[in-house]
Amino acid sequence: MNDELRQEISEIASKFKLFECNTCALSIQEFLIQRGISEKKVKIYTGSAKGKYGNIYHDDLGQNIATNGRHEGIAVKIDGEELIFDNIHNEGIPKQEWLGKFYCLALDLGGEFEIAEMEF
């Protein structure tokens, strides 16, 4: 079941491009709810959506993945490991690794991402 679930979530997530994280997360969430699976949405926020402070840069891609200060994905426990699925990591990635992929200007100024988790 876990391999099948991961494959189905990956198929959903792979349909979305950069800057479509919200729609991607909603689609995955709806899929899981329809199957009676409770998980959570994980959101990161730079603290500002204005100008350069709203940019979220992805280290592996070498480019911005958000200009509104926000990005989100869905956390799913598979084989005891919490994986995040989003429009960039459609195969799923461990949560701490996912969080470590992002950069924003606030980090250089001593700030950090605001992280919110909402169960569904």
Where are these predicted regions, by residue range?
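A structural boundary/capping signal
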Residues: 1-120
